[in-house]
């Protein structure tokens, strides 16, 4: 969940990560995105710590030694299992049934970067691995709608100035 929310990666990108794709020294990770397109994303402290903690605690696999995330059987974790883990985490935190999905975590990451990280749409396009800026702009329009709705929902929104 830390990687989804901090990096905005796709589910397929997460399950495809190999240990050899992570460069802790340069704080970056190589992802294989849509259309087998490679991209590098940089990791913040939360991601570095989560990855280091996970690697230290995970069992090594003879079957797939380079796969980062493993199933209990020592194989690369499946997309479905990641979805189940996310759902289990949501249930444990009381957030289950609220329409949150793995893909919504990606949307949330993009929205947070755009709103609070001073990340422009071109940079966000590269981080998310979008082919077209139009796809990225969906996230920014969503953010602007949220901001407009927030302004409109103010209890002071309907107070009018009295003319003197």
Report the location of each language-model feature:
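Short pre-functional
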Residues: 1-12, 28-29, 111-112, 155
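C-terminal catalytic core of tyrosine-transesterase DNA break-rejoin enzymes
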Residues: 2, 6, 106-130, 138
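Conserved tyrosine-mediated DNA breakage-rejoining catalytic core shared by Y-recombinases
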Residues: 7, 11-12, 16-53
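Short coil/turn motifs that cap or connect alpha-helices
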Residues: 10, 18-20, 96, 131-134
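Catalytic-site neighborhood detector that most strongly recognizes the C-terminal catalytic loop/helix
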Residues: 35, 128, 132-153
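Active-site/catalytic core of tyrosine-dependent DNA strand-transfer enzymes
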Residues: 45-96
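Catalytic tyrosine of NAD(P)H-dependent dehydrogenase/reductases that use a Tyr as the general acid/base
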Residues: 99-103, 139
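C-terminal secondary-structure termini that scaffold catalytic or DNA-interacting sites
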Residues: 155-164
């Amino acid at each position: 969940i830390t990687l989804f929310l901090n990096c905005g990666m796709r589910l397929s990108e997460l399950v495809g990560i190999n240990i050899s794709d992570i460069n802790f020294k340069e704080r970056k990770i190589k992802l294989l995105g849509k259309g087998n397109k490679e991209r590098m994303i940089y990791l913040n402290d939360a991601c570095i710590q989560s990855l280091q903690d996970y690697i230290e605690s995970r069992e090594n696999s003879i079957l797939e030694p380079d796969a980062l995330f493993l199933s209990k059987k020592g194989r690369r974790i499946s997309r479905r299992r990641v979805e189940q883990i996310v759902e289990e985490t949501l249930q444990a935190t009381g957030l289950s049934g609220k329409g949150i999905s793995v893909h919504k975590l990606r949307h949330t990451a993009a929205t947070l970067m755009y709103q609070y990280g001073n990340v422009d749409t071109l940079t966000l396009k590269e981080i998310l691995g979008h082919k077209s800026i139009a796809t990225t702009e969906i996230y920014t329009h969503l953010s602007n709608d949220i901001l407009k709705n927030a302004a409109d929902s103010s209890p002071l929104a309907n107070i009018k100035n009295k003319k003197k």
